[in-house]
Amino acid sequence: MSDIAKDKAARLLKKRGSIISLGSHDVKPRGSFSKTKDSVSTVSYIDEPGHHDEIQSPAILMENTYQIGPAKRFPVASVNNILKDVLTSYLQEEKYEAELCRQMTKTISEVIKARVKDLMIPRYKIIVLIYIGQLNDQSMRVGSRCIWDPANDTFSSYSFKNSSLFALANVYGVYYE
C-alpha cells in the first residue's frame, strides 16, 4: 500500500471513528506511586477543515466591504431560546446510555447550528459545542479560550439536566471581518 493510500485511510479512520485518550496514562511524574482511577475521554467526531477528500473548488474572491462592525448584532436571547428548546425536546425523557448520547451530541449540534443559521445573522461564524454526560453527583468544569473582539464576538450557553444525564450547549458567534 502506498504512503498516499495509507495517509488517506488514516484520515478517513480518524474522521469517522472515535478517538479515545487515557488521561492518566499520558504523563506521570516521577516518584508518584498513588493509585488513581483512569480517566477516559472520548471524542466521537472530528471535522478537520482542509483535509477533505473531495476535489477542492477554486476560492471565490469577493470585494472588500470596508465594514468594520456588524450591521446586525448576534441575538444572544434568541439563541438561548433555541438552545433551551432543542435540549429540552431531545433530552427530556432520555436515559443516559453512552452510545446514544454520542449520537445525540452530533444530532443536537447539527440541529442547533441549522436553527441558528436560520436566523440569518450576516457575517458571523457559528461554532456549536455540546457536552452530554451521566449525572452521578459529580462536578465538571468546562472552559474555552478564544482570541476575539469583545465588541462584536459573543457566545450563548444553556445547561440542561434530568434524572440521569446532564447536557451543556455552547454557541459561539464570531464576527467575520
From Swiss-Prot:
Coiled coil: none annotated. One of its GO terms (biological process) is microtubule-based movement. InterPro entries: Tctex-1-like (IPR005334), Tctex-1-like_sf (IPR038586). GO terms for cellular component: cytoplasm; cytoplasmic dynein complex. GO terms for molecular function: dynein intermediate chain binding. It comes from the Eukaryota. Belongs to the dynein light chain Tctex-type family. This is Dynein light chain Tctex-type 5-A. It comes from Xenopus laevis (African clawed frog).
